[in-house]
Amino acid sequence: MISANDKSTDTNVDSTQAEQKIAEKQNKLLSGIIERATKSSLGRKKLNPSVVESAVAKKMEEIHKNPTKLRLVVLGGGSFGTAMANLAARNGCDTTLWVRNKRTVKAMAKSQMNKKYLPGYKLDDRLKYSHELQAAVKDTDIIFIAVPGLAFRETLKSIAPFISGQSIVSLTKGMEKDTFSLMSDIIKDELPEVNFGVMSGPNLAIEIMKNMPSATVIASESEPLRHAVQAALHSAFFRVFASDDIRGVELGGALKNIYAIAMGMAAAYEVGENTKAMILTRGLAEMSRFGVHAGANPLTFLGLSGVGDLYATCSSELSRNYRIGNMLGRGMTIDAAVKKLGQTAEGVNTIQQVHEKATKEGIYMPITHALYAVIYEDKAALGVALHLMEAGFRSDVEFVMEHDHSNASLTAQMQTANSQSKEDKSKQGNK
């Protein structure tokens, strides 16, 4: 005989199983990640971030000791991709660094060093290397893509046949040259069924390799993916914060390169701290203005992926975009500067893309337009800077005070003020 309690228990079991099936369906592309990352019994649906963070912290030591907990591959052997692969391997994740060139892979495996991009920094013994894309990608939980923006779409097309449940995290900052697409847009175009995220922040690779305290942001609509990335990369020297504003985090990482070029140019003229502060804050204003127009949360730009990344990139001579700007400020042509740098400076293309979009859609971006004039129209940098300083009156923080982006309102105010001044002088003369 089955009692009422037994029936109730069966009902509860059925209900629980149904909820589990729904949760598993929602997160089917993340199979095994949370279990490998935390070994906790927490469900996947509507996870409590504080509870998961606590569970991850408790299990972090075990995660670091057991290399089978999370299986990762980083595509791209540049400075940042190498730094992230090294960090994951050091944390105990089963990590492979994929590099296209077979000879480079052999050299890295033999020397345990990326001599081209991170010379002098020994990589973790547990880090594996591969030039075979299929072998590197299959049977992994997360694919981190750290290739230049120009190669991002082609890389996704190359791995598409080998996708069988992996999640993708973009480490690439910038926009596609001809389409104005961000990396998340390209992922949705090429692999629409894949669970994905983007990572961005003030992350100079050499400082990370030196174990200097740093932090970044993982943005994804998938809470399990956010927690998995945090578990994989979090360490005593590297904190990973979470966000669900993919657009804002990604735009912060792309747009700040523009103002790093501006800051590098300004440094070439040996400007003072006032000028640097002005470039930094007015650059942030442009970033948030453009971001809101694109659907981002303006508050995101006050975080690590916004002002944090902007500050680091604008104040460090390690920044490729800063160095490009500095060379331009010293009289080099853009072609000569890029050739001397020998690496990709995403900001050069971003300036052109943002200038065109802002012009088309009426977004007020004076610093961007000025840089475009210098780089693509061969205008004198000093003359363009003086023109910027002579621009019309504006309020400081436009999310606090309403803006009229045209100068019509300003012109009317000035005309009224001039008329009033003439009347006052006339009255004084009559007296």
From Swiss-Prot:
EC number of the protein: 1.1.1.94
Location relative to the cell: Cytoplasm
Pfam family, one: NAD_Gly3P_dh_C
Active site: K256
Role played: Catalyzes the reduction of the glycolytic intermediate dihydroxyacetone phosphate (DHAP) to sn-glycerol 3-phosphate (G3P), the key precursor for phospholipid synthesis.
Family to which the UniProt record says this protein belongs: Belongs to the NAD-dependent glycerol-3-phosphate dehydrogenase family.
Name of this chain's protein: Glycerol-3-phosphate dehydrogenase [NAD(P)+]
Organism: Psychrobacter cryohalolentis (strain ATCC BAA-1226 / DSM 17306 / VKM B-2378 / K5)
